[in-house]
């Protein structure tokens, strides 16, 4: 027992020092960006020589590149719930496409909620907690969001599988004879319209507008921005 108690004390002491230093120094604005189903093997900063990802590569060069950051679960819902609440999936009991709030309970804060309760304006654009892709994006609905986390929320409705344009089902369709399939399938759609017709284009525009608007806030802001690609279906202009 002795071996476990001393590191625990040091950890608690470190947390206390960290919290006191937060109070002492200026509260900084926080921009949190998350994409959907983006594997590190598709990024130049992790060694991919084919995909062109200059903006992410620059962030990696100027910041911290994590090499041992792991998903907490094998799919979206539990991973997002774990990330946003800081609990392992076995604690959130979010085994499906939920926010995790149902099992965590109203007395536990997500970290956006913690910032909100400590003087921050907390906002999100599009998918941060779970949203169904394509259904919630096509409808512009909240999905399995956590309302207690935000002062402000914006959804980015956009065309999905049935967008006007040329589409093809690639999943289990080697000869190209299958019709365009809906749902969570490996589908490519060359959709009509430019970036601002699509969910991610709208999300980027809204996020930029909020950052400019928040210059006049009398408090710091936390802005969470969620992009739904490269989650299937691959719908792009």
Name each model feature, range by range.
Residues 1-11:
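Bacterial N-terminal signal peptides that target proteins for export
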Residues 10-20:
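Bacterial N-terminal signal peptides
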Residues 23-237:
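Formylglycine-dependent sulfatase
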């Amino acid at each position: 027992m002795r071996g476990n108690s001393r590191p625990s004390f040091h950890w608690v002491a470190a947390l206390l020092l960290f919290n006191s230093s937060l109070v002492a120094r200026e509260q900084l604005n926080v921009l949190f960006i998350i994409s959907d189903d983006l594997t590190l093997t598709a990024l130049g900063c992790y060694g991919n020589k084919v995909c062109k990802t200059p903006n992410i590569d620059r962030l990696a060069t100027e910041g911290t590149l994590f090499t041992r950051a792991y998903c907490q679960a094998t799919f979206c819902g539990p991973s997002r719930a774990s990330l946003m609440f800081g609990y392992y999936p076995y604690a959130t009991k979010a085994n499906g496409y939920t926010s995790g709030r149902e099992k965590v309970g109203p007395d536990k804060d997500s970290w956006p909620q913690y910032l909100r309760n400590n003087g921050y304006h907390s906002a999100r654009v599009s998918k941060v907690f779970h949203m169904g892709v394509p259904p919630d994006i096509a409808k512009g609905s909240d999905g399995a969001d956590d309302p207690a986390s935000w002062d402000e929320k914006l959804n980015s409705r956009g065309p999905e599988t049935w967008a006007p344009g040329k589409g093809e089902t690639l999943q289990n369709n080697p000869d190209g004879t299958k019709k365009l399939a809906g749902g969570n399938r490996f589908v490519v759609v060359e959709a009509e319209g430019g970036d601002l017709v699509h969910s991610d284009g709208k999300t980027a525009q809204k996020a930029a507008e909020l950052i400019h608007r928040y210059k006049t806030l009398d408090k710091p802001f936390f802005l969470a921005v969620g992009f739904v690609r490269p989650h299937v279906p691959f719908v792009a202009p």
